[in-house]
């Protein structure tokens, strides 16, 4: 193993730059050459590859986004796309690859591994929806972004004695909604993994009113329905004329938290070690604060599950 490359793919997540920095500096420390691939798998196929030095990743640790850029390239799922990628890697004499991203990125990494090219996956997505790890890079930062907004919305909800609905990201996973809702004291948390009944939500709000509570916060994951649609349905139950805030892509940006920076650094460094050990086809992660690695194919077969105990706790504490 003399040369390795790194790319970021799919939706950006705070901490991707920190992980890239760790891969580059750990690899150079171990005597390897490192190449950065711009625009994910699209850049790989197009040969948009450049050599990275120690200084290339300076002033990156605290920056959100990804300086390697990202792009969606569904064509990489085809044999033609994968063979073009392998051709470019061989052309640049690259021996191993690190891929930072979510589920789709892992599929690309697995495809390369099956074609005999050593590839390591690093979980980088704000959704926290990757199996084999307690946390993904970017989740903690996104969570704190949502919590900051929730706290501020709580101020105005209290001042005007209103119900506010906050729509957060999470098409298939409700971790952002659950964790931010619990941390922010939301009166109701609506996630894709748990069915909900509007009658139950209204009953919870009414009980709060009976105790003298004059405002409430409801956090809705986008995968369930839009915040506006939820507000429309809620209004059918009486004078719940809720205000809606859609946080959108602000959740993806911002300087990564200390937790995400440290997590990204640990996962990035471990990825290089695995390549040096000629152990491709693995995804790194963190379990109970220990860095672990799992077969990337097995990770893709597993379905991420919501923390049921945490969901139940949020329901109890929001009474």
From Swiss-Prot:
**GO cellular component: a single term:** 6-phosphofructokinase complex
Sites where the protein binds ATP: 11, 72-73, 102-105
To which pathway does this protein belong?
Carbohydrate degradation; glycolysis; D-glyceraldehyde 3-phosphate and glycerone phosphate from D-glucose: step 3/4
* Catalysis: reaction(s): beta-D-fructose 6-phosphate + ATP = beta-D-fructose 1,6-bisphosphate + ADP + H(+)
* Cofactor dependence: Mg(2+)
| Keyword Kinase applies | yes
Q: For binding Mg(2+), which residues are annotated in this chain's numbering?
A: 103
State if Transferase is listed as a keyword. Answer: yes
Q: What Enzyme Commission number does this protein have?
A: 2.7.1.11
Q: Which Gene3D superfamilies match?
A: 3.40.50.450, Phosphofructokinase domain (3.40.50.460)
Where in or outside the cell it occurs: the entry states: Cytoplasm
Residues that coordinate or bind ADP: 21-25, 154, 185-187, 211, 213-215
Keywords on this record?
A: Allosteric enzyme, ATP-binding, Cytoplasm, Glycolysis, Kinase, Magnesium, Metal-binding, Nucleotide-binding, Transferase
| Residues bound to substrate | 125-127, 162, 169-171, 222, 243, 249-252
How the protein is activated or inhibited is described as:
Allosterically activated by ADP and other diphosphonucleosides, and allosterically inhibited by phosphoenolpyruvate.
Q: What is its main location?
A: cytoplasm
Family the entry assigns: Belongs to the phosphofructokinase type A (PFKA) family. ATP-dependent PFK group I subfamily. Prokaryotic clade 'B1' sub-subfamily.
Complexes and interactors: Homotetramer.
Name the job this protein performs: Catalyzes the phosphorylation of D-fructose 6-phosphate to fructose 1,6-bisphosphate by ATP, the first committing step of glycolysis.
Protein name (Swiss-Prot/TrEMBL): ATP-dependent 6-phosphofructokinase
Species whose genome carries this gene: Listeria innocua serovar 6a (strain ATCC BAA-680 / CLIP 11262)
């Amino acid at each position: 193993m003399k040369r390795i490359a790194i790319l970021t793919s799919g939706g950006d997540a705070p901490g991707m730059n920190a992980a890239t920095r760790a891969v580059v500096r750990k690899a150079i420390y171990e005597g390897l050459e490192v190449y950065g691939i711009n625009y994910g798998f699209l850049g790989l196929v197009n040969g948009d590859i450049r050599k990275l030095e120690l200084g290339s990743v300076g002033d990156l640790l605290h920056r959100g986004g990804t300086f390697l850029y990202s792009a969606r390239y569904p064509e990489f799922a085809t044999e033609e796309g994968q063979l073009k990628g392998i051709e470019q890697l061989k052309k640049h004499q690259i021996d191993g690859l690190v891929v930072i991203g979510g589920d789709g990125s892992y599929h690309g990494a697995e495809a390369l591994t099956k074609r005999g090219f050593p590839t390591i996956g690093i979980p980088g997505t704000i959704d926290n929806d990757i199996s084999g790890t307690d946390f993904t890079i970017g989740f903690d930062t996104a969570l704190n972004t949502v919590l900051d907004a929730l706290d501020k919305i709580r101020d105005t909800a209290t001042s005007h004695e209103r119900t506010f609905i906050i729509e957060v990201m999470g098409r298939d996973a409700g971790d952002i909604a659950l964790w931010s809702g619990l941390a922010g004291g939301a009166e109701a948390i609506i996630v894709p993994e748990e069915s909900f009944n509007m009658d139950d939500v209204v009953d919870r709000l009414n009980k709060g009113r009976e105790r003298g509570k004059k405002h409430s916060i409801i956090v809705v994951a986008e995968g369930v329905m839009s915040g506006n649609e939820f507000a429309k349905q809620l209004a059918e139950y009486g004078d719940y004329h809720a205000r809606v805030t859609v946080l959108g892509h602000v959740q993806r940006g911002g300087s990564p938290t200390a937790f995400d920076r440290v997590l990204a650094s640990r996962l990035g460094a471990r990825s290089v070690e695995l390549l040096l050990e000629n152990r491709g086809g693995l995804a790194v992660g963190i379990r109970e604060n220990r860095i672990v690695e799992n077969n990337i194919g097995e990770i893709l077969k597993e379905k991420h599950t919501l923390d049921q105990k945490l969901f139940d706790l949020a329901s109890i504490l929001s009474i």
